[in-house]
Each structure stands twice: as C-alpha cells, then as structure tokens.
A protein has these predicted regions:
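Conserved catalytic core of the tyrosine transesterase superfamily
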Residues: 1-356
Length: 356
C-alpha cells in the first residue's frame, strides 16, 4: 500500500480506502440507505459498514428479483416506504433465499448459519434505525427468529504441532534446490518471524501486516498494535519472538523498499508492505506440511496462543485482555470446552477419604 502521505499510518490509510470503497457501494443502494450508514458511522468501523452495505444490498436484490410487485422497479428509485411493504413471511423467505441464491453477477452463493446470522443482524439493525425514527410503521425483522448458531470446535495446533511448524519453516530449505531454494532463502527469516509472532502474541493477521518497524520496542519487548475498532495497545512478547524478529530485522536491513513502504515491518517479495492474503497463503502452505487434518490459518495460530495462555494461567480475563476482546464473554464462549476440562480435573483433585 502506497504511503503518499508519510504522516498517515497504515491504519489511517486502510480507513481512508475503506471509506472510499463504502461510498462506491452506497451508490448501488437506494438513496435513503445513506441515512442509516451515516448514523452508525460513530459506532462502527468502515470495514463493518462495508460488510453491512453488501448484506443490505443482497436484501434489496432479493426484493427486486423475487417479489412480483417489484419486478419493474429499479434500486435507485426505491424509497423508505418499501420497508413497510415487507411482512414477516417475506423475511422468512429471505432467510431461506440466503441459503442458496444467485448473486447480482450470476454467481451461485451460499451461506452457513454464521453468514445467515450476520446478514440478518445487518437487516435488523437497518430496520431498527428507520423504525426508531418513526420513518416506518412496522419492523417485521423482530417477528422472525434469528438463526441458531451451533458451537464450533476451536481448531488449534497442539504443542508438538507448533514446534513442528516452526522447525519446518526453519529447516525445510535443506531439501530444496534451484529457484525454490532461492525463494525460500529470501523469505525464510520473514516467514519465521511472522509465524513466531502470531503464535507468541496472538495478534490478528490485520494487526501483524499493519506493523511498522517503529512499533517494536526491544527494551520492553513490546509491540504497538492498532486493535480492531482503532484502539491502540502494547502487546508483549517473549524471547523466542524477540530472536525471530531480530534475525528478520538483520535480513530486512539489506532490502531497499519501494518508495512509500519504508516504515513497513514485513515486506513482500515485491519489497512492499506484505498483505493479509499473502500471510494467509504462507501460513497455509507451511501448515499443510505439518498437519493434513487441520486447516490452519493465521486466525488458528491466534486460537493456539489463546488456548496455550488459558491452559497456563486459567485466567479468562487475562486472555480476553491480551487478545483484545472487548467482551470477556466472547473469550469465555471460545474456551468453554477447556473450562469443562478444568472442572473435570477439579472433581478428581478433591479427595474426601484417603482410602475410600
């Protein structure tokens, strides 16, 4: 990402890009929808608003294509009273439609229960805004049950797999030759530093790629990250992360970055700030060699860190704080199965008689 303005941080640039993208998406929605997105601006990120805009657009696309009375209507001509014409049964049909539907671009789309719930949450929020301001008389979204979410098992690396992954990144070049060997040598220290950092701090991949070299403080072994929502936080790291970062920085000193990318901590092979997708592909590439049964992504490395920290400390509030969860219930929900394991061990730990 180009730093045309050297005073802008990576986070600021992403916000600007997302704001511009949102404006483009809003042009494809009914004009009255802008009021809603303007109203939620203070309490949501631009990225969240973009997701909501796409979700709301699917709803209007559904109305225009599936409702016979609206067949000849155009998106730009829809007014707010269209919302009052929708009944609870229409919302239920929409939920059914979301499971499998043709998108505006004639591509078949599907939604699992999480995608379904997110789209329904967006629609509820959209309706609530106009209902609260008495611009519509009814809110049919309140009459329809939200999709039920089933708990998903947390996918994480076991301690042995974590060690195997780091060992593989460090030594897999021994079996390589030719161009593959050259590429590996160019990316080895960077890849090891990124994976070690993700495993050793639990930061998000978006936070990782957004790091500038100035964000690392080896005096306190802390990194400054911009959390989801824009808040700033110092996250501390241990000796293994410190060593991996220092080794990478030594290699990084020999790279001449593309203009505007001088501050980026992690570079792509094009000498620009590395992107989220590049990190995701890199993690998947290495993880496939270590485990074939688990689909490991950067987020799974974050789950691995959270699991390890909770096992070591048993402090759910500490885990929530370090992971940057605003609500401890989010953390507790993810690690509920581990709580059950701890309760089982607690039952065995208490002896009432020495020889029952």
């Amino acid at each position: 990402m180009d730093k045309n303005n050297h005073n802008m941080t990576y986070h600021d640039q992403v916000t600007v890009q997302n704001t511009l993208k949102l404006r483009e998406v809003l042009k494809t929605l009914p004009p009255f929808a802008k009021d809603y997105f303007r109203a939620i601006e203070p309490i949501t990120s631009a990225k969240t608003r973009i997701s909501y805009a796409y979700d709301i657009r699917i709803f209007f696309h559904f109305l225009l294509t599936e409702n016979p009375s609206l067949k000849n209507k155009q998106m730009e001509n829809l007014t707010v009273d269209i919302l009052d014409q929708v009944q609870a049964v229409d919302i239920e049909e929409y939920q059914e439609y979301l499971k499998v539907y043709d998108s505006e671009f004639d591509k078949l789309q599907t939604n699992g229960e999480r995608g379904l719930k997110r789209k329904m949450s967006a629609l509820r929020s959209f309706y609530a805004y106009y209902y609260k301001r008495e611009m519509i008389k009814t809110n049919p979204t309140l009459l329809v049950d939200m999709p039920k979410l089933h708990d998903k098992e947390i996918i994480r690396l076991d301690p042995d797999e974590t060690a195997d992954l780091l060992d593989y990144i460090e030594h897999c070049g021994d079996q390589l030759t030719g161009q593959k060997k050259i590429y590996y040598e160019k990316t080895k220290y960077r890849d090891l530093a990124i994976v070690t950092l993700l495993l050793g701090t639990g930061i998000r991949v978006s936070e990782c790629v957004g790091l500038d070299v100035e964000d690392i403080d080896f005096k306190s072994n802390g990194i400054r990250v911009i959390r989801k929502g824009g808040s700033e936080m110092i996250v501390y790291f241990g000796e293994e992360v410190e060593l991996a970062l220092k080794n990478y920085l030594e290699y990084r000193n020999n790279i001449t970055p593309v203009a505007g990318h001088e501050h980026a901590l992690f570079y792509s092979t094009q000498r620009k700030r590395i992107g989220i997708q590049a990190v995701e592909n890199m993690v998947k590439k290495y993880a496939r060699e270590v485990t074939t049964t688990k689909k490991i992504t950067p987020h799974k490395l974050r789950s691995t860190y959270g699991t390890t920290l909770y096992r070591e400390t048993g402090d759910i509030y500490l885990v929530a704080d370090v992971l940057g969860h605003k609500d401890v219930n989010t953390t507790r929900k993810h690690y509920a199965a581990m709580d059950d394991d701890r309760r089982r061990r607690a039952a065995k730990a208490v002896r009432l008689r020495e020889n029952p």
